[in-house]
Structures are given as structure tokens and as C-alpha cells.
Swiss-Prot record:
Recorded coiled-coil stretches: none
One biological process term in Gene Ontology: killing of cells of another organism
Name of the molecule in the record: Defensin-like protein AX2
Top-level taxon: Eukaryota
SS bond partners: C3-C46, C14-C34, C20-C40, C24-C42
Pfam families: Gamma-thionin
Organism whose genome encodes this protein: Beta vulgaris (Sugar beet)
InterPro entries: Defensin_plant (IPR008176), Scorpion_toxin-like (IPR003614), Scorpion_toxin-like_sf (IPR036574)
Biological role: Strong inhibiting activity against C.beticola and other filamentous fungi. Little or no effect against bacteria.
Family label: Belongs to the DEFL family.
Keywords assigned: Antibiotic, Antimicrobial, Disulfide bond, Fungicide, Plant defense
Tissues expressing the protein: Leaves and flowers.
């Protein structure tokens, strides 16, 4: 299963998974992906 949460650090529209992941890494979450609506979501195994 994958746990998900919105990134606290990412601001603006999310177009790059790499930038999103960098923001999530600052929050100690290993993965980040841009979602529909240009939101950055952090993901990790539960």
C-alpha cells in the first residue's frame, strides 16, 4: 500500500515530478508526484 499526503513545502503549480520529489524529500518522504490539478503529493510505502 502507498501512503499519500500533500507536500507542505511545494508551492505553485506542479509540472515536474522531480521538483515535487525534492520538496517531499525535505519532509522525509521518499517519493513525490504531480497530480491532476497541478498539486504535489508525497508518497511512501505504508
Amino acid at each position: 500500500a502507498t501512503c499519500r499526503k500533500p507536500s507542505m513545502y511545494f508551492s505553485g503549480a506542479c509540472f515536474s515530478d522531480t521538483n515535487c520529489q525534492k520538496a517531499c524529500n525535505r519532509e522525509d518522504w521518499p517519493n513525490g508526484k504531480c497530480l491532476v490539478g497541478f498539486k504535489c503529493e508525497c508518497q511512501r510505502p505504508c
